[in-house]
Amino acid sequence: MELLHSINDFNEAKQVIAGGVNSPVRAFKSVKGTPPFILKGKGAYLYDVDNNHYIDFVQSWGPLIFGHADEEIEENIINTLKKGTSFGAPTELETTLAKEIISCYEGLDKVRLVNSGTEATMSAIRLARAYSQKDDLIKFEGCYHGHSDSLLVKAGSGCATFGSPSSLGVPNDFSKHTLVARYNDLNSTEECFKKGDVGCVIIEPIAGNMGLVPAQKEFLLGLKALCEKYQAVLILDEVMSGFRASLSGSQEFYGVVPDLVTFGKVIGAGLPLACFGGRAEIMDLLSPIGGVYQAGTLSGNPLAVCAGLSALYKIKRDKTLYTRLNALAVRLTQGLKRSAQNYNIALETLNRGSMFGFFFNENAVCDFDDALKSDTEMFAKFHQKMLFKGVYLACSSFETGFICEPMTEEMIDLVVAKADESFDEIIKGV
C-alpha cells in the first residue's frame, strides 16, 4: 500500500490549514503516521486518493450507524436540499425530530437543537448553572465534553492524545469553577462537592474519549444520589453513546434519569447536529421565554435535521439492529483478544452495543489513570500495521471504535485475521 498522494495532499494542507487538519486527532500524530486523504465512503468502506480502500471502524467518529452514503438517507437529504439549504426560521421537520428523540429517552420533556456536541454541553452547563444558581461544575478525569473553556481540564480525546492536561488560552477565572473527580470513584466525587458550591455535574455515562470506559452501575446510581443530596443538576453527555450503545443510550444499561442530557453524532447521521434537553422546568429557562440566552444561525438546519430524522426512522424500523451490531462488536473484541493472547500480548477489550475499545494493558481499565498506563507505542505499531492491511482504526488509543450496519461477520473475521498477522509481524520485528 502506498500513500504518495496523501503525503502530498497533507503537505499542501499544512501550508494553508493550521496543522493541516481541522480537528487535531486527524493528523495521525500520536501514531507517527500520515493520514490517508479520503476520496469517498460507501457502506463499511473508505476509499482514499491513492486508490486504497479500508474497512472503516471510525465511521466519522460515530455518527454513521448505517455506514457511509446510505441510499435512503442520501436520497432524503437530496430531496430536502432541493427545497433550500437553510431558512433561519422554524420548520416542521425540527418538531418531528424533537418528538422522535424525546420518545426514546426517559425524563426528556423538551430539547433544543444545536450544531455540535460542544455547543450542546456548553449550553446545558449554562442552563444548569442558571437553574441551580450555583457556579461550580464537577467533571471527570478523561471525559471529553467538547472544547469550551470550562471543560478543557483533564479532558480525554485529543487532550489525552497530545498529553495536554488542559489547553493554553483558558483563563484561570474559567477553570477555577471546574472541579475534577476520578471516574468511577464516588469518594473523589463527594470530596469535590464538599470543596465548592456545585451547581452541576457532567459525565459521559459510557466514556468514549479515554478509550471506551463505561461507568460502573453502582457509581452512576451513587452519582445521581449525590446530585440530589447537594441539589446539583446532573447532565449526562450522551453525544457519543446516545442512539449508539442502544436506542435509549446509557439508560439501557443503567436506568439513570438525568436532569439534562446531550445528544449528537447519530442524531445528525454525519451532518452537523446535536441537541440538549431535559425536564421542562429547566428547559423553560431558555430564551425566548426565559433568561438563559442560547442561539445559532444554523441550528435546526433542514439538511442535518432531515439526515438525523431519516437515521432515527431507520433505527426504529429495524427491531434487531442493536442486537446485530452488539454481536459483531463482541465477535471483534473477542477475536482481537484471542489473537493477542496467542502472542502473549496484553490486551483488554470491551464493548457497549456498537461501541468498542481495546487497550494494550494487562489490567481492566476503569478510569483515566488506568487508561494512561496503556502501551501507546504498541498501539502505534498495531495501528500502522492494520492501516496498511486495509483496516481503518481510530488513530489514538484514547478513542472509541464503531460498528456500522453494513458490516458482516465475514468482514469481522477478516479483520481479526489481519490483527493476527499484525501481532505476528510486531513480535518478529518485521
Swiss-Prot record:
Main location: cytoplasm
Family annotation (CDD domains): OAT_like (cd00610)
UniProt entry keywords in alphabetical sequence: Cytoplasm, Isomerase, Porphyrin biosynthesis, Pyridoxal phosphate
Enzyme class, UniProt record, top EC level: isomerase
Stored PROSITE patterns: AA_TRANSFER_CLASS_3
Gene Ontology molecular-function annotations: glutamate-1-semialdehyde 2,1-aminomutase activity; pyridoxal phosphate binding; transaminase activity
Family that this chain belongs to: Belongs to the class-III pyridoxal-phosphate-dependent aminotransferase family. HemL subfamily.
HAMAP family the UniProt entry points to: HemL_aminotrans_3
Protein name: Glutamate-1-semialdehyde 2,1-aminomutase
Organism this protein belongs to: Helicobacter pylori (strain P12)
Gene transcribed to yield this protein: hemL
